[in-house]
Amino acid sequence: MRSPERVLNSLSEHSKDASYKFERLYRILFNEEMFYVAYQRIYAKEGNMTKGSDGQTIDNMSLKRIDKLIDTLKDETYQPQPSKRVYIPKKNGKKRPLGVPTFNDKLIQEVVRMVLEAIYEGSFEYTSHGFRPNRSCHTALTHIQKEFSGAKWFVEGDIKGFFDNINHDVLINILMERIADERFIRLVRKFLKAGYIEEWQFHNTYSGTPQGGIISPILANIYLDKLDKYIKEYTTKFDKGKKRKFSRESMDFGNARKRIVRRLKSVKDERQRTKLILELKAIEQGRAKYPNGEEMDADYRRMKYARYADDFIVGVIGSKQDAKQIKEDIKNFLADKLALELSDEKTLVTHTERVAKFLGYEITVRKSNDQRRDKRGRLRRTYGKRVCLNVSTETVRKKLFDWGVLELTNRNGKEIWKPKCKSGLIFNDDLEILDSYNREIVGFYNYYSIANNCAHALNNFSYIMEYSMYKTFAGKYKCRTRKINKKYRKNGKFIVKHMTKAGVKERYFYDGGFKRKKPTYKSECDTMPRTIYTAGRTSLIERLKARECELCGATDDLVMHHVRKLKNLQGKESWERHMIARKRKTIAVCRSCHKKIHDGKID
């Protein structure tokens, strides 16, 4: 049986031929090694300990469980279970439905996802950034900052309920353009039609992909790749002219400069030469205040585009009418070809000197007459028409408010921010309180670290988080914040001491500052890179194959016991001490020991 690496690399190589049709894909799902890789890739996710609609979790995983799954795939008796529907809050206060598949379904979906990624990833457009290897929100924003310079208009795209409205027939037809395997297509359709359970009631799914399903992101990208390719073709037709005409001012200053340079070549008198040089400098200073090209050149148009999942934005160098026409054409394409609806109310045509919103950032094109000299010593404007990415005060305020660390008061009609005790943490130990604040600070900073106004915008954020932490410690110990600072502050740093096996260690409150980071395509990505996990001696599958219980040493078929978090273990039982010592959330045990663990009867 071929290794997963060879299987996926072969698919990837064949995908380079756009006319190639993939057959016999379904047979890949009979390869147990593919399931071993899938298990290794998804086992650590906390959601795997959440029960699906079948009442099971990742716990009790075994090689036999995989073999049984493969048998049901071989005879096509496998039927995905309906996902359990839960709701998570959205930024606008509404709630987004999320499906929780059973773990068996997650495992098969991960294998299918790997196959689909190997086939389609190489053909996706560079303008697509969501849920792709080595891509992220940051790569999308960096793309905009590099490509959208000089744009006059933004078209902010909003597709109504995209994930809930993906047309199953359209999606299947798109898949069949490259995949000629009826059994594989039937399996994908089974996932789409699996339905969901909400409040003990089963609901059919007639459209959409289940948000929360492992294959949903790749299916969404395959679907919207049609939009990406349409935009690519549209851009080729829309773009016009090689470069902008020189502006009237630029030509006038250029001609004046040429005249003075000619005179300088013939004038020998030093006083006259000094006078001409001063005139030349004045011309260069005046020229730097104006754009080189004609901003409203009717013979020059450009269109730029970026997409992250179902959010997209278009930058237009052209007229407002051009931008409106682009919006209308995209709307018609989505309706006619993809059975999707573009929201007229939320799909805005915005002048680039105003704010467009994308992925939590505010985007503008900044116009400035600030000057500095380039490498050749010529005066240039610092910002001609460059894209600025900003984090808004409202974004910072809302996040602090959501975390429960901000109290708003009003003084003389002005909103005042005051730090607030995070009462939900006062019963936690000191290290947990410190780590909670550090995680939130670093997470927020990492996401907004490429904002042009990062350092300035996060000043208040830093103050509120720091003093909220002081108030939380003060609430825990029923004292004033001054006493907390006296107890924990050392050499200007807030320190929590904690005991480890190596002795007493110190953990610091974050004080790394909020300097803007240079955007890079190596930013933290949304998905794991497309590499195959090479199982080592201590991998999950090798431990199951060893057939030696890690608790009692008995030789037998093993199951993997999983826990949600290591920190929840108290270390009172031998199996807990075993997991804590090895810093693992898993332990391979015989069925007898596994039953004793759950019954609380382990020695």
Describe these PLM feature segments.
Residues 1-603:
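Non-catalytic terminal/accessory segments
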